[in-house]
Every structure is written in C-alpha cells, then in structure tokens.
Amino acid sequence: GDSMRARHICLGTGPANRPRLPGIPGIAQFKGHSFHTCRWDYNYTGGGPNGGLTGLADKTVAIIGTGATAVQCVPALGESAKQLYVFQRTPSSVDERNNAETDPAWAASLKPGWQKERQRKFGEAFLGGPIDPAFVDDGWTRLTRNLKALVAQSGESVSGLAQIADFKTMETIRGLVDDTVKDPAVAEKLKAYYNQFCKRPTFNDFYLDTFNRENVELVDVSASQGVEAITEHGIIANGQEYPVDCIIYASGFEITSSYERRLGIPIFGVAGQSIYEHWQAGMRSMHGLMVSGFPNLFLCG
C-alpha cells in the first residue's frame, strides 16, 4: 500500500462504519448474488442512488431488514425488481417526509444571514430550547414541540405527558399505514407498536405505498425472531423456502464492538502507545476533538 505523510490527520470515520452481517445459518452457502446495503453493487443492479435499477428487471430480490436503510432502499427495489421479498422482524415507524421542491419566490424572500440563523435555531432545538417552526419544522422536532405545548397547557409532570405525546404521535403514524396500505393484513404487520424512539424514527413518502405493488411481498418473521436459514438458492422463513436471485442485507453496522475493530487501523501517539491502549479505561478527549499524547490528530465524528 501507499505511504503518506501529513501534518494533521482528521478521523471522520463515525461510529457506524463497519457493516454487520446477520448470523443466519447457511449464509455462506448462497450461490446467488448478495451484498450489504453499504456496499451496494451497482454493477449488478444497474442504476444509481436515485433508482433506475434496470439490472433487477428479471430478478427476484430479497432484502433482509426493515430499519432506516431499508426504508430508503425498498421503494427503488420494488419499482425495479421483477419480484421483491421484504423480510421484516420488527417494523419501523415510518412518518411522512413531505419533501418538496423549494418555492423560488420563498427562496428569493429570505434575508441575508438566514443560513446562520437557521443553524442557531437548529442547535437550540437539539439542546432543548424553543423550536421555531419557521426555521425548523420536521418530524424530528415535532414530537418535542407537541410535548412542550402539552406541558404549557396542563402543568403536569413531563414524564407522564411525554408518554401521552408519544402515543398520539405513534397513533398518527399507525393511521398513516392504514390510509396508505390497501391490504389490511399487510398494514397491520407494518404498524409499529412501541414508543417512537424505541427504534430510530424514519421518514419516507414512498416506502408504505411500495407494499401496494403486486410484485412486492412482506414476509413477517417476528414469530421466529428472524429468518431461519439461507440455502444455496434462497431464504427459509416460517418453514417456507423463498427462491431468490439476490439477497440484500440491510442489517446495519457494528455499534458495540471495540473501537479498534470498527476503525481497523493502528494509531500510535508520541510515546508509542496505541490510542486503543490509551482508551482502555474509557474514551477521553478534549471537547471530543483532541486526545492527549496524540498531537495533530483530530476526531471529527
């Protein structure tokens, strides 16, 4: 490999950089094509990040997982594949994104400095400050805004009102499933019955409607707590084999494994000590940006 020298090194690897494959029996036996979503194989699927996966037009595809990544992938897969099986253990809460083109007249009306003001308001929102819908108005901030409104009206304890606000939000999301998915049995399987932040909330305007397509089938594996096995030709779930040409793993990333394993590169400080040894008793840094003994090394995420 190449050897490079630099005065400053910035680590922008983030916590989710090592893909995690599920421990499904037989995963190595599959003779079709397979890949993890973060290692998307466009040579096989065709198309690009915005869809148009023409290489799947004659393929039966399975995607395992229905988390935040799958919510983004499923609409394009359903649109392009001959047949799509979506294997779901626990449904995600999928709220409306309501993404739309920016109104040119509105954009022209913005005063100089609006970007900085929006950044300030966004920071305040995440620190628990007041949320101004004129600057930040999305699904992430709506729950907090609704909770604050309830507290102001009643004066009751925050914890009890938080549960009420959360329930109302989730009821709205479950109602969206009923309004969108035509088959009541499929709709029921797609409903999330838990607090909104039990799993990462998702927002998409096309995911739920994808299950109205004739070429898309939701395979609920909640009873068996996941896919049972993978064979040479497909996936076994609920005692049934689903022959497929391609398996896509939307199974997330390693989060709780060691930092050394996730980063995958050795880092030594001025005393010859590795950063992993330095952090054996726990990660510590200055403002989450610099580490004593490792000059000119910056942590950016």
Indicate residue ranges for each PLM-predicted region.
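N-terminal FAD-binding dinucleotide-binding subdomain shared by FAD-dependent oxidases/monooxygenases
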Residues: 1-34, 38-39, 43-44, 49-58, ...
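N-terminal Rossmann-fold NAD(P) dinucleotide-binding loop
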Residues: 70
